[in-house]
């Protein structure tokens, strides 16, 4: 989730291999659960797709371009099953397909929630006092403080959702920005 100190935004709601997933909510009040991303100019798009592998199956980005954004706060972690369950128990969020046929590998409390639609992700963010980040905000947060080039130094994942925070944080102090699951914006 991301925020402008007054307004929170969730860093994304995700899907993993055609499954929808949701990241963790942020609260500006609890300083250690969020990171401030400074405003400024950021590159939006992928250097890798633009310069090296424009024919790669996953390269669906628009042309690389500069965007200007203001400062915002974003959660350090993706929304876990346990986080999303609180919203469901409060009667605000729809169930995240909590059926017996859901693979047990997707049910662990600390794993990112899956089977959540974009609308459900927005509802969750609003319940937490925030909103989803824009694509530009998410990319600025994911890029970290590294300038230029691709960001493949981060571990990409293991082929199945892992507990939130399992992989090393990027230079902004955000976890699981590459790999694990994709994010809604």
State where each predicted segment sits.
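Short, compositionally biased
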Residues: 1-94, 118-119
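Functional-site microenvironments in short loops/helix caps that host divalent-cation chemistry
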Residues: 36-37, 43-57, 94, 100-185
